[in-house]
């Protein structure tokens, strides 16, 4: 759908790139039994380096779709906005019905039950989007078409 090849980079890629010991012992990232996510010492430094790397990729001329979860709401967006400096960004908020989110979560073996419900309450707090898209009943393709049409009017 995109006119050139783009990269998809997201929070799950960052987590996979982190040292196992910081994930296993919870010192970098801890996911509670109810799905609450807490970050430990060192997370922000690694996150900042990741963001700077993504910004460098975009600065080199490669398009990137960033799949991020703003666990800190507005503060999380500000960290990413700062790293991206003057780069052109289309901020897209992705939402879905809580029942749909629970069903999708159940299909993912890497998710703790309740994680989606916990996160939906915090990830959009104070975040400013150029557009939002509800994926509850829309296909990924139709969502992509909607986003692409917005990209063509803003770039």
Can you describe what each PLM-predicted range is?
Residues 1-49, 55:
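Conserved substrate/cofactor phosphate-moiety recognition/catalytic segment
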Residues 84-106, 133:
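Conserved phosphate-donor/acceptor-positioning beta-strand/loop module used by diverse small-molecule
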């Amino acid at each position: 759908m995109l006119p050139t090849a783009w990269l998809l980079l997201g929070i799950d890629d960052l987590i996979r790139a982190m040292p196992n010991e910081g994930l296993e012992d919870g010192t970098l990232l801890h996911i509670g039994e109810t799905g609450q996510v807490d970050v430990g010492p060192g997370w922000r430094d690694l996150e900042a380096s990741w963001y700077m790397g993504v910004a460098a990729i975009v600065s080199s001329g490669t398009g990137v779709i960033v799949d991020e979860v703003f666990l800190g709401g507005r503060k999380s967006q500000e960290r990413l906005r700062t790293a991206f400096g003057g780069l052109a960004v289309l901020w897209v908020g992705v939402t879905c019905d809580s029942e749909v989110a629970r069903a999708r979560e159940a299909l993912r073996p890497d998710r703790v039950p309740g994680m989606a419900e916990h996160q939906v309450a915090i990830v959009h707090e104070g975040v400013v989007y150029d557009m939002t898209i509800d994926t509850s009943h829309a296909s990924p393709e139709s969502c992509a078409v909607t986003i692409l049409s917005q990209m063509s009017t803003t770039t």
